[in-house]
Amino acid sequence: MSRSIKKGPFVAERLEAKVVTMNAKSEKKVVKTWSRASTILPEFVGHTFAVHNGNKFIPVYVTENMVGHKLGEFSPTRLFRGHAGQKADVKKKGGK
């Protein structure tokens, strides 16, 4: 179920305040955040956020296509190393 329109999107107050002050000064700094649940607002476009993935901070540059999504969607928490496959030197028998 989605969030109520009456409540509006969730954004950490400190995060939004930092972006508003940076927009007023027209400066672009990397904003470090642990708030993966914050929704990306149109004011965030053009800024870079360092989003924590549980281990380190992943830089996320916000574009217009990201508006409405959560910051955590762009900072993966798990490392996918691929499925187990055949070794390169082992060949299949009975080549047809």
From Swiss-Prot:
The keyword rRNA-binding applies. This is Small ribosomal subunit protein uS19. The keyword Ribonucleoprotein applies. InterPro entries: Ribosomal_uS19, Ribosomal_uS19_bac-type, Ribosomal_uS19_CS, Ribosomal_uS19_SF. It comes from Gemmatimonas aurantiaca (strain DSM 14586 / JCM 11422 / NBRC 100505 / T-27). Belongs to the universal ribosomal protein uS19 family. Keywords: Ribonucleoprotein, Ribosomal protein, RNA-binding, rRNA-binding. One of its GO terms (molecular function) is structural constituent of ribosome. It comes from the Bacteria. One of its GO terms (cellular component) is cytoplasm. GO terms for biological process: ribosomal small subunit assembly; translation. Pfam families: Ribosomal_S19.
